[in-house]
From Swiss-Prot:
This is Acetylglutamate kinase. It is found in: Cytoplasm. Its main location: cytoplasm. It catalyses: N-acetyl-L-glutamate + ATP = N-acetyl-L-glutamyl 5-phosphate + ADP. Catalyzes the ATP-dependent phosphorylation of N-acetyl-L-glutamate. GO terms for cellular component: cytoplasm. GO terms for molecular function: acetylglutamate kinase activity; ATP binding. NCBIfam families: argB. Its EC number is 2.7.2.8. Keywords: Amino-acid biosynthesis, Arginine biosynthesis, ATP-binding, Cytoplasm, Kinase, Nucleotide-binding, Transferase. Belongs to the acetylglutamate kinase family. ArgB subfamily. It comes from Halalkalibacterium halodurans (strain ATCC BAA-125 / DSM 18197 / FERM 7344 / JCM 9153 / C-125). The gene is argB. GO terms for biological process: arginine biosynthetic process via ornithine; L-arginine biosynthetic process. Signal peptide: none annotated.
Amino acid sequence: MGDIVVIKCGGSVLDSLSDSFFTSVRRLQAEGAKPIIVHGGGPAINGMLAKLEVETTFVDGLRKTTDSVLSVAEMVLCGQTNKKVVRKLQKAGVKSIGLSGSDGELVRVKAIDEAILGYVGEPVHVNGELLHMLVADGFVPVLAPIGVNDEFEPYNVNADTVAGAVATALQAKELIFVTDVAGILKDDELVPALTPEEVESLIEEGTIYGGMIPKVRSAIHSLTGTLEAVSIVNGNDVFFAESGKLIGTTIKKQVIHSQG
């Protein structure tokens, strides 16, 4: 196998990730893949901001990040959430290392709109050489979405965006979105494979609805460059079976017949 696989864990599912999830990461690595995990941490940041009585607002889904908010975000993402994921991986027998985009200039960013969003950045460069070195040595890097600009100032970055940038920079073959659902269901049955066109049809007919719509559209948007497949899996269960098969819904560029 030997391919880079980027796994994005949203903040909303981090606390509920089961032992089976971490076992699946170990199994994926044992099959020869080279996993890299990118995590969010929105709910944990919200909780700490509330505890410290720091106000926070959102603009078009992005957290407006002032000096105070950034300090809390960096503390929670890098110091708490990141290390929690690393410890759970190590407990499952996975050699892992926790990093942020600041470490080794892993994720260089530029401000999106400082006047409106404050210290919120978008990736302009990923240090793929460092990540390749780590995975070649058997590590699973766990990345917190804090990056630095050209002046080495920290910026808050959307975790989905970081995952996409890492996947592109390292020419990953697959990007896995870890959610709280098994994948896309139709008539209560898991749909194992779809094309982007089939996804849009399921949205139009109402099979895909609510919070799943932005998840699948984000997945489709990620299908660029060498990325051949984006999968949606359940973090509360095994997502990589002993047979070597991914359990979830995989969206691929090329035409797939999901039935039969």
